[in-house]
């Protein structure tokens, strides 16, 4: 896969593409795509017996403050093949800090072109409380048994904040090209 050829999205930051690294409900393995080769590597085995609460990946051509492309959790129930690209709408952000510093997670849903199931979801507050709690619980605890690693939740932000994070990440990536 040539990541350089994958567009950011149809109308960033409102409509973006996400390259999936870890499918929803998969075994506790953290995969990470090598951004130069496009190859998927095993980053680590997650020590807690937890599964990702959504399909997890990143937006191409972005750069977060942690020097990686911006992370995205796609809220849907169907596991996607690692390496595939899905078009999504950002609906919020989970603001976190971990052993590596600031670590925001964009929360998104598939675009209406892919499925009508999320047509009524406009902001993270439209998700059920149970879904939000699962997402928080996962990201708060998935590093618990890894020596020297930790994660702390700072809070939720709305879709406008998420879009601003994405726009900043796009500009940051352009600045280093």
Swiss-Prot record:
<comment type="subunit">
    <text>Homohexamer.</text>
</comment>
<dbReference type="GO" id="GO:0000287">
    <property type="term" value="F:magnesium ion binding"/>
</dbReference>
<comment type="function">
    <text>Catalyzes the hydrolysis of inorganic pyrophosphate (PPi) forming two phosphate ions.</text>
</comment>
<feature type="binding site">
    <location>
        <position position="44"/>
    </location>
    <ligand>
        <name>substrate</name>
    </ligand>
</feature>
<dbReference type="Pfam" id="PF00719">
    <property type="entry name" value="Pyrophosphatase"/>
</dbReference>
<dbReference type="InterPro" id="IPR008162">
    <property type="entry name" value="Pyrophosphatase"/>
</dbReference>
<feature type="binding site">
    <location>
        <position position="71"/>
    </location>
    <ligand>
        <name>Mg(2+) 1</name>
    </ligand>
</feature>
<dbReference type="GO" id="GO:0006796">
    <property type="term" value="P:phosphate-containing compound metabolic process"/>
</dbReference>
<dbReference type="GO" id="GO:0005737">
    <property type="term" value="C:cytoplasm"/>
</dbReference>
<keyword id="KW-0479">Metal-binding</keyword>
<keyword id="KW-0378">Hydrolase</keyword>
<feature type="binding site">
    <location>
        <position position="71"/>
    </location>
    <ligand>
        <name>Mg(2+) 2</name>
    </ligand>
</feature>
<dbReference type="InterPro" id="IPR036649">
    <property type="entry name" value="Pyrophosphatase_sf"/>
</dbReference>
<keyword id="KW-0963">Cytoplasm</keyword>
<feature type="binding site">
    <location>
        <position position="103"/>
    </location>
    <ligand>
        <name>Mg(2+) 1</name>
    </ligand>
</feature>
<comment type="similarity">
    <text>Belongs to the PPase family.</text>
</comment>
<keyword id="KW-0460">Magnesium</keyword>
<protein>
    <recommendedName>
        <fullName>Inorganic pyrophosphatase</fullName>
        <ecNumber>3.6.1.1</ecNumber>
    </recommendedName>
</protein>
<feature type="binding site">
    <location>
        <position position="56"/>
    </location>
    <ligand>
        <name>substrate</name>
    </ligand>
</feature>
<dbReference type="GO" id="GO:0004427">
    <property type="term" value="F:inorganic diphosphate phosphatase activity"/>
</dbReference>
<feature type="binding site">
    <location>
        <position position="30"/>
    </location>
    <ligand>
        <name>substrate</name>
    </ligand>
</feature>
<feature type="binding site">
    <location>
        <position position="66"/>
    </location>
    <ligand>
        <name>Mg(2+) 1</name>
    </ligand>
</feature>
<feature type="binding site">
    <location>
        <position position="142"/>
    </location>
    <ligand>
        <name>substrate</name>
    </ligand>
</feature>
């Amino acid at each position: 896969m040539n990541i350089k050829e994958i567009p950011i999205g149809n109308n960033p930051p409102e409509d973006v593409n996400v390259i999936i690294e870890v499918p929803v409900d998969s075994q506790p393995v953290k995969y990470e795509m090598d951004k130069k080769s496009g190859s998927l590597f095993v980053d680590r085995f997650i020590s807690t017996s937890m599964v990702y609460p959504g399909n997890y990946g990143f937006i191409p051509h972005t750069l977060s403050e942690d020097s990686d492309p911006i992370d995205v959790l796609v809220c849907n129930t169907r596991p996607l093949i690692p390496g595939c690209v899905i078009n999504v709408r950002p609906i919020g952000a989970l603001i976190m800090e971990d052993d590596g510093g600031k670590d925001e997670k964009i929360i998104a849903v598939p675009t209406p072109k892919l499925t009508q199931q999320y047509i009524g979801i406009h902001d993270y507050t439209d998700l059920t409380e149970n879904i939000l709690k699962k997402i928080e619980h996962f990201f708060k605890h998935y590093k618990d048994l890894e020596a020297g690693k930790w994660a702390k939740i700072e809070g939720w932000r709305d879709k406008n904040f998420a879009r601003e994070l994405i726009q900043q990440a796009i500009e940051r990536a352009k600045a280093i090209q």
